UniProtKB/Swiss-Prot annotation:
InterPro entries the UniProt entry points to: Aep1 (IPR031467)
Entry's Gene Ontology molecular function annotations: translation regulator activity
Transit peptide: 1-19
Family, as annotated: Belongs to the AEP1 family.
Function: Required for translation of the mitochondrial OLI1 transcript encoding subunit 9 of mitochondrial ATP synthase.
Miscellaneous comment as given in the Swiss-Prot or TrEMBL entry: Present with 504 molecules/cell in log phase SD medium.
GO BP terms in the entry: regulation of translation
Residue intervals passing through the bilayer: none
GO cellular component: mitochondrion
Name of this chain's protein: ATPase expression protein 1, mitochondrial
Places the protein is found: Mitochondrion
Taxonomic path: Eukaryota, Fungi, Dikarya, Ascomycota, Saccharomycotina
Keywords, in A-Z order: Mitochondrion, Transit peptide, Translation regulation
Length: 518
């Protein structure tokens, strides 16, 4: 029994939580808490609230929901495995952390309510309507400068013409800033010239080199606390700067240019907002910034701007989304490690409405390797099945789905059942006439499971021609099955020696039969 203050202090010191930060989100390192020789249940084992789950496409089917509601003890989704990416509060620091959670309940109480909230949230994401940003640049048109106005800018043009490198940029920035002030001092009463129009004109006509563009970005930053006092003006300037960045350079961008532009964005935030300025930026400018940060490999900012576009009901261009996914793959080196998949989910959590309603083939191909449970794979396949380009998407992704099915378990009977489920989901898309090239892939996958019954059924139903080459592929798959599942299911219907003998005699030529003889 613990009786003294010292003993209590000693006991408390046995309990500890360590934090580890990597990549984007801080992550809870799940070190067991020890007290009185017993392990305390880890906080991450609690079923998260539906709002805390960031999985962008998993949707439990009606059967999964019924099973969870009808199971009295430890009902679960996804077999109760720790694969549901969630943002939860750390139990001690109260900071938001990224963890893989179990969707495993202690008992049946509250499961139905939890499911209703989770499904309602998914339905809300499904109902979000996104529209492409208007490509009208009318908002960014600058006031036409007359020849008289342009003549007033001659001093600025002369300074810009003399710049050759970045070594003397600071002094040139001061010179341009002073000349700007002189222009406004000389013409303060009747001028129609505004600072944003002058800078936009200079960026458009003289920002063709990195050095001059950096100078004009720095001048813009200096003018933030004098004549650039509205976000409308900053939209005009940022639009022209980002157009020039896009036109002038291919990634990787000059580090000096990247620093100058990001310093300007930080200064805009400090000048106009306590936090971030996205709410007052034009959607076209936000999309430009998204594209820019993707190209610079800044995934954190890319995610911020992408999420903001979606929240504003804007559908980013498909090419931008594809580049974002490529940047994620590059950052994580197409890793399938548990931690990296969890982190990748954090970067695509905002894409739920796009996956549901505007998914592209490239997006679906990106998502398939991220599935860690067959039910996730089925959720994704059902989204594709309901999409407007279902047939074209299935044509491009079905071989990847078939291959992925066999990665969740080594049990041949479970794999066979999962293969049959996938086949039943996609076959209506083809009006039950599944192309023979896909049927053949299913047959080979069933061969890898040693399932002679399903192989024979599909060969007969779809009248598959067994060429010499294809028979050899089947034989190799069956041999692999015998090696991998030598002690499993040998007596099960469809897998036993009688079915093997029947299949060999009916479907394989004499020369091929010998290869499978004991």
């Amino acid at each position: 029994m613990i009786t003294t203050v010292q003993e209590i202090s000693k006991w408390r010191n046995l309990c500890f939580i360590r934090m580890q930060s990597r990549k984007w989100y801080p992550v809870l390192k799940k070190t067991p808490l020890v007290a009185d020789g017993r392990k305390i249940i880890k906080h991450a084992d609690k079923v998260p609230h539906p709002e805390e789950i960031i999985h962008p496409f998993y949707q439990p089917t009606a059967i999964e929901q019924f099973t969870a509601c009808a199971t009295e003890y430890n009902p679960s989704l996804l077999d109760g495995k720790k694969i549901a990416p969630s943002l939860i509060k750390h139990p001690v620091s109260l900071k938001t952390i990224l963890v893989d959670s179990k969707l495993k309940f202690d008992d049946i109480r509250g499961v139905n309510k939890w499911l209703m909230e989770f499904v309602a949230r998914r339905q809300h994401q499904r109902n979000i309507v996104l529209t492409p940003a208007s490509k009208s640049v009318r908002s960014f048109h600058v006031l036409h400068l007359s020849s008289t106005d342009i003549a007033k800018l001659r001093g600025l043009e002369n300074i810009l013409s003399e710049i050759e490198n970045t070594n003397d940029l600071q002094s040139r920035v001061e010179s341009v800033n002073n000349e700007l002030q002189n222009i406004f001092d000389r013409d303060s009463k009747q001028t129609r010239l505004f600072c944003e129009n002058i800078l936009a004109y200079l960026i458009k006509n003289y920002g063709n080199s990195t050095e001059k563009l950096i100078l004009l970005i720095n001048v813009t930053e200096m003018q933030l606390y004098s004549r650039l006092d509205q976000m409308k003006a900053m939209n005009i300037i940022l639009y022209n700067i980002l157009c020039k960045v896009e036109a002038n350079e291919n990634p990787p961008y000059s580090p000096t240019l990247v620093t100058a532009l990001e310093n300007l964005l930080a200064a805009i935030n400090n000048r106009f907002f306590p936090g971030r300025c996205e709410n007052s930026l034009h959607p076209i400018v936000i999309e430009q910034l998204l594209s820019y940060f993707i190209k610079t490999g800044n995934l954190n900012e890319s995610k911020n701007f992408l999420g903001h576009l979606i929240k504003k009901g804007i559908l980013p261009e498909a090419t931008i989304i594809n580049r974002y996914l490529e940047a994620i793959d590059v950052h994580f080196d197409k890793s399938t490690k548990i931690f990296d998949i969890r982190s990748k989910f954090a970067f695509i959590a905002d894409l739920a409405p796009i996956i549901e309603n505007y998914g592209t083939i490239d997006l679906f191909k990106f998502l398939i390797p991220m599935c860690r449970h067959f039910d996730e794979l089925c959720s994704l396949l059902n989204i594709i099945r309901k999409s407007n380009n279902a047939k074209r998407a299935v044509d491009s992704t079905l071989p990847i789905f078939i291959k992925k099915v066999l990665t969740f378990t080594k049990d041949p009977m479970i794999n066979s059942g999962n293969l049959s489920t996938v086949f039943n989901i996609v076959s209506p898309i083809y009006g039950q006439n599944v192309p023979s090239e896909f049927v053949e892939k299913f047959i080979l996958s069933f061969a890898l499971q040693g399932n002679y019954t399903m192989m024979a059924h599909m060969i007969d139903t779809y009248k598959i021609k067994l060429s010499h080459k294809y028979q050899l592929q089947i034989i190799r798959a069956l041999k692999n099955s015998e090696r991998n599942h030598a002690l499993k299911n040998t007596g099960a219907v469809g897998y036993n020696k009688e079915f093997k003998k029947y299949f060999i005699e009916k479907y394989l030529n004499c020369t091929e039969r010998e290869a499978l003889r004991p």
